[in-house]
Design a protein with these regions (language model features):
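N-terminal, polar/Ser/Thr-rich
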Residues: 1-33, 58, 102, 106-115, ...
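Beta-strand-rich binding/interaction modules
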Residues: 47, 57-63, 428-431, 439-527, ...
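Hydrophobic alpha-helical and helix-loop surface patches within well-folded domains
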Residues: 172, 201-459
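Extended, low-hydrophobicity, Ser/Thr/Pro/Gly-biased non-transmembrane segments
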Residues: 91-194, 219-221, 432, 556-558
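Surface-exposed beta-strand/loop patches in extracellular or lumenal glycoproteins
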Residues: 37-56, 127-129, 135-144, 415, ...
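A surface-exposed beta-strand-loop module
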Residues: 43-45, 52-108, 129, 164-165, ...
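Long, ordered, helix-rich scaffold segments
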Residues: 373-374, 517-867
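Short acidic/polar inter-strand loop motif in beta-rich domains
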Residues: 93-101, 464-465, 531-537
């Protein structure tokens, strides 16, 4: 397999600009013929014109005359082109129904959709397919009117008509220049839900959501989420929508969550369709977040885009930050923040410590699809949040305004964003640039001592070596701190001339001591408040210190983190006891703290549910070597069993309290969702303590399962039960919702994530289910993806879990390398496993690597893991 690596250092501005792009799609069966007419302007006359493409090439013309060209692989080179502005006409033929990669133009059912980010446009036609080539697009679509009554593309519809042969045509014009990755086309038989939004300047924007006719009743929440996002972006950022129409199309076959194509967003149905019968509270929250995210891209991604794909976090990190803020402003800011932190630590921290570690702005890649990562998105969002922490809301907004003033309509870099933040606030952020160029999660080691009424906090920072870089420079790290006395009260202190109960300490050196003055009593420091930087922070807290922070700290993150640390210590003690073959510890202090949390009626319910959540196995073994996953699983399960049995009466009582507070008729709202979240926590502990309770659940299932959140909670709680009753409940669930694709995704996820002893057998059976298709990414992620995260089965001692996933990677890679590359990253833990499992994984990876025709998507990941 040939290996082509692209490097950030090799960036050159494009030799040619494409001022105007006129596209003509003639959709027939089975082929679609695409004609493009490009108005090209040389930037460096004399260089050849190089176009990217993989479609069947029919013809190439320059200024109307047939052109001489060389086609090698996916590169079309025209050596002899005019030195002044000229036109290029390219005609290609594509077969959408045969395109199983879901990139470019592809069929989903009887309809056609596109996905062009990052390099899908080249599957449609030949083009300078890079984000810094921005062009004004006009698109004409011709198709059979009966089969494809709806024809959509970017921008505003400016013309249309019918032919005598039963075909019709529509012409779309996008007045804003955009790169090719933002092009979109949809053709099919779709129903539309319409609404309107009046912008802050009084413009009346038409909103259209396209779905199947059957799904039309499920789009209401997504429509309202869009209107809320449009209003929020005006209020918080002063950003107004710029076209006459905003369209969203939902498709069931989609590699990603959604795509922000200018004026024509294409969404995975998972993030559009919802009602109480089929969607959980988490689904509703996900829809609001993703709808917001894609809308916010209109400014942070579309109006200002990336110069090159190495700068992907410029748009994605910033827009994730914006959608997190949107969700936080909508409901439960503290809980949303902790959920984001947990996502980061469960998924991005291991990525930063593994074989695929890369900076927020990568320096090289073989396959760009592999860099749509947690690092680029979630760590990128934390980098943006640090700007906000350092500058405050006012300073951050000043930076945003300058960013748009300088760069609206341009393709720019992460450094341009940093410069806008620095210049708008008169601050030097040169050192901050290391967050973009250094991979790895910084580790802070902190110590504190009280001396002469000064609490001296000493912090040392190290950035661990990663495959791309051994030696790292000290980072600029904001550490937000507070102090509590032994009664749990906030203690004021003086720092840099200000007296307060909280301050942001700015680390810029490998080791610094920060004097917090005017402290006259013993204190416990509350460190990294709000998770002010994406780092590990270690401080020699005693258990009593952590119990005090858990009971009294006003900062939600440090309170939750105290609980997480106590749980981690308890699991570590269980792990040691299991290894030594002795009895498990009693954990009396932890249990007393948990009892207080359960009994605290003043706690927010969603926050209480978070405090009662034990870290996952992946969080528990993070930062360790020679990992035996089953030992961690056993130690964690033992702690959960202890909590379940010890507080069984309290779980029953708390469940009854929550049931009383819920509305009888389900309607999603953050307040009622919090109660349902707590109920599901209680149910899980009850069914863990009393597995036989499953029979009562089965008898009263229809009464208990009033909405999908309840059904999800109940089935999750019984999913590991070895009885036939569990199988019957799951089968009933599948029968009940057999015609709902998204709920069937939930069913397949239950099968793949079960801890039952026969799970692998049940997964293999589910592969033959009439509603399962490996070619559908949602289905593959639900069944195969969930199994790859199933600790006891994926990491089975005999290697059967590894073999199963490897076989599926090979199978999926033949038609959808992007999904296969995501799945193969389940093996990223390879080199940290104990020797037996490490060898098993390496055997499977070598088998994958030996496959003829292996994609560069999968090959790049496998190569990095094997080293």
């Amino acid at each position: 397999m040939s290996k082509t690596v692209r490097y950030l250092k090799d960036y050159q501005t494009p030799a040619y600009r494409i001022l105007e792009t006129e596209l003509h799609f003639d959709i027939a069966e089975p082929q679609t013929v695409v004609k493009s007419r490009l108005t090209v302007e040389p930037q460096r006359a004399g260089e050849p014109l190089v176009l990217d493409g993989s479609a069947k090439l029919l013809s190439v013309k320059i200024n109307g005359a047939a052109a001489d060209y060389v086609l090698e692989g996916e590169t079309l080179t025209i050596a002899d082109v005019p030195s002044e502005r000229f036109t290029v006409e390219v005609e290609t033929e594509i077969l959408p129904a045969e395109n199983k990669s879901l990139m470019g133009l592809y069929a989903s059912g009887a309809n056609l959709f596109t996905q062009c980010e990052p390099e899908g446009f080249r599957k449609i036609t030949f083009y300078i397919d890079r984000p810094d080539v921005m062009s004004k697009f006009t698109t004409t679509i011709v198709a059979d009117k009966k089969r494809y009554p709806v024809l959509l593309s970017n921008g505003n519809k400016i013309d249309g008509g019918e032919f005598s042969d039963g075909r019709h045509w529509v012409k779309w014009e996008d007045p804003f220049a955009k790169p090719s990755y933002l092009f979109a086309l949809v053709a099919g038989d779709l129903a539309v839900t319409e609404d309107r939004f009046t912008t802050m300047s009084g413009r009346n924007v038409k909103i259209e959501f396209y779905t199947t006719e059957a799904d039309k009743p499920k789009v209401g929440f997504a429509v309202e989420s869009l209107k809320n996002a449009m209003k929020w972006d005006e209020t918080r950022f002063g950003l107004e929508y710029d076209l006459d129409i905003f369209m969203v199309v939902a498709v069931g076959d989609f590699n990603m969550g959604a795509m922000e194509n200018k004026g024509l967003n294409i969404f995975n149905t998972k993030f559009v369709l919802a009602d109480s019968r089929t969607a959980t509270d988490t689904d509703f929250e996900g829809i609001e977040s993703v709808v917001g995210h894609e809308y916010f891209h209109n400014w942070t991604g579309n109006r200002v885009t990336c110069r090159d794909w190495f700068q992907l976090s410029l748009k994605e990190g910033l827009t994730v930050f914006r959608d997190q803020e949107f969700s936080g402003d909508r409901a439960g800011r503290a809980v949303r923040r902790i959920e984001n932190i947990r996502l980061l630590r469960q998924n991005q921290f291991p990525e930063d410590a593994g074989p695929t570690a890369h900076p927020v702005r990568p320096v090289s890649y073989e396959e760009m699809n592999n860099f749509y990562t947690m690092t680029v998105y979630e760590k990128g969002a934390e980098v943006v949040r640090m700007y906000h922490t350092l500058l405050g809301e006012e300073g951050f907004q000043k930076g945003m305004k300058l960013y748009f003033q300088r760069h609206d309509g341009q393709a720019v870099t992460c450094d341009d964003f940093r410069a806008a933040m620095a210049d708008a606030n008169g601050i030097n952020l040169d050192q901050f640039a290391l967050w973009y160029s250094q991979a790895g999660t910084p580790v802070l080691e902190a110590e504190g001592r009280l001396k002469n009424n000064v609490f001296e906090l000493t912090i040392k920072q190290t950035v661990p070596p990663t495959p791309d870089m051994a030696d790292k420079q000290p980072m600029m790290i904001p550490v937000k701190v507070g102090l509590l006395n032994r009664n749990g009260e906030a203690v004021a202190f003086d720092y840099q001339g200000k007296r307060a109960t909280e301050a942001v300490l700015l680390m810029t050196e490998a080791e610094q001591t920060f004097p917090l003055e005017g402290v006259t009593e013993a204190v416990v420091p509350s460190l990294l408040r709000g998770f002010s930087a994406p780092v590990y922070l270690n401080y020699p807290y005693s258990d009593d210190d952590l119990l005090l922070l858990l009971a009294h700290d006003s900062d939600a993150f440090t309170c939750w983190e105290a609980a997480q640390t106590l749980y981690r210590r308890a699991v570590a003690a269980n792990l040691a006891a299991l290894s030594d073959g002795i009895g498990l510890p009693k954990h009396e202090k932890l249990l007393a703290a948990v009892e207080k949390v359960i009994s605290d009626d003043l706690l927010d319910n969603a926050f209480k549910a978070l405090l009662l959540g034990v870290p996952s196995e992946a969080e528990l073994w993070d930062g360790t070597e020679n990992i035996d996953p089953l030992r961690y699983h056993q130690a964690r399960e033992a702690l959960l069993d202890t909590l379940a049995v010890r507080f069984l009466p309290k779980w029953h009582e708390l469940n009854r309290q929550a049931a009383k507070q819920e509305n009888q008729s389900y309607e999603y709202s953050p307040e009622t969702a919090d109660w349902r979240t707590l109920r599901n926590v209680c149910r899980a502990f009850v069914l863990r303590a009393e597995p036989v309770h499953i029979e009562t659940v089965a008898e009263k299932y229809s009464e208990m399962a009033q909405n999908m959140t309840h059904e999800w909670g109940i089935l999750s709680a019984v999913n590991g039960n070895e009885s036939d009753t569990r199988n019957r409940l799951l089968a009933q669930f599948a029968d009940k919702f057999s015609d709902d694709a998204l709920v069937m995704d939930k069913y397949f996820a239950f099968v793949g994530s079960s801890r039952r002893s026969d799970t692998l057998q049940q997964v293999q059976t589910a592969l033959q289910h009439p509603k399962f298709s490996l070619e559908n990414p949602n289905k593959a992620r639900s069944l195969i993806g969930s199994f790859s995260r199933n600790v006891p089965h994926f990491h089975a001692q005999d290697g059967s879990g590894y073999r199963f996933i490897a076989d599926k990677v090979i199978e999926i890679d033949r038609f959808n390398p992007q999904v296969a590359a995501r799945l193969v990253q389940a093996f990223n833990l390879c080199n940290k496993l104990e020797p037996h499992r490490k060898n098993l994984v390496k055997q499977e990876l070598q088998c994958i690597r030996a496959q003829e025709g292996l994609s560069k998507d999968v090959g790049e990941i496998v190569g990095k893991i094997l080293g």
